[in-house]
Amino acid sequence: MKKRVLAALMCAAMAMTLVVGCGSKGGSDDASKDDAAADSGSDVITVGFSQVGAESDWRTANSESMKSTFSKENGYDLIFDDAQQKQENQITAIRNFIQQEVDYILLAPVTETGWDTVLQEAKDADIPVIIIDRMVDVSDDSLYTTWVGTDALLEGRKASEWLNAYAEGKGIKAADLNIVDIQGTIGSTAQIGRTQGLEEGVDKYGWNLLAQQTGEFTQAKGQEVTESLLKQYDNINVVYCENDNEAFGAIDAIEAAGKKVGGDIANGEIMVMSFDTTKAGLTDTLDGKITCDVECNPLHGPRAEELIKKMEAGEDVEKLNYVDEEIFAHDDTVKSVTAVNSLDKEADYDVTTLTQEILDQRAY
């Protein structure tokens, strides 16, 4: 912010020199054009964004939201960096952003820990840092300015409450639910929250949690892990996938094993639950291959821009900024659930029975 003001003042001074030195009408016109161009350039906000990678459809939608929001047409110069799932790449990118003197740094961290040093460097450079999606676990919260994302723990709790209500609605005993958890990238905010939400449900309702293994948020790993678990356990009837891509892999593995995917657990089907609600994930929900899909809204760009505009205006911003999210199901067995968010606030959440019309209206 300060750099843009200084640049504008320098350009204005140069323009005044041109007016005095040339003296002619033509020179004055040229100087006015240069001054206008300088004023226009001074309004450009430079944003450096370190994205964790492109491991899932959700992540692709998240990146596109950032790119479309922080476009040149909207008055931004976006420096986008794909870290390819490596924290060391993100640390390097942040240091490059600092050297480039960007106005804001946006970071979608691969994991929660290990950021203190580089975020201190950004703070020392007086560059505001907005954390995107996953959270960071730092010794001093002042190392970042604000956070935009989803409540992963609430997502997990929503899923667990839905499963309990669904089982009750279908007359399935809690002790008859045999669950495997295909976890996300270990240590990520989404994995921590969604895993905790399931584990709380297991403790609360007495379900059988047979195994937990990471699928790394990818379809290939999700399929590999599910194939292995199906060989180890012949009584699995719920596969709890921590994102849509893992669910796609799980569905492939279940069908390849000659078993049927669906919500009719009492008659031998294996239920797949998921998170994200990507277009492909909701298509599988409509088809009944995913019985419940809890939304993890990837459209963080507009909310991040809203915060930047507030900071540009000298306004304070909230530390935590949650985006709105829904629950989608294949059928209407469950109408709503009650769950507690990360701020210990309890609320009721409607469950939307998916239709083709709803799917067609989705932005991602």
Q: What positions do the PLM features span?
A:
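Hydrophobic alpha-helical
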Residues: 99, 107-124, 198, 215-283
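Hydrophobic alpha-helical segments within soluble ligand-binding/sensing domains
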Residues: 47, 90, 148-176, 221-223, ...
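Extracytoplasmic "Venus flytrap"
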Residues: 45-73, 78-92, 96, 100-102, ...
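Hinge/cleft segment of the Venus flytrap/periplasmic-binding protein
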Residues: 43-45, 181-186, 200-202, 296, ...
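Short, low-complexity disordered leader/linker segments with a strong preference
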Residues: 1-46, 71-72, 77, 120-127, ...
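Short, solvent-exposed amphipathic alpha-helices that sit
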Residues: 58-72, 155-159, 189-207, 225, ...
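Flexible loop/hinge segments that line or gate small-molecule binding clefts
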Residues: 117-154, 178, 278-284
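Short beta-strand elements at the ligand-binding edges of bilobed clamshell
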Residues: 80-82, 138-165, 212, 287-298
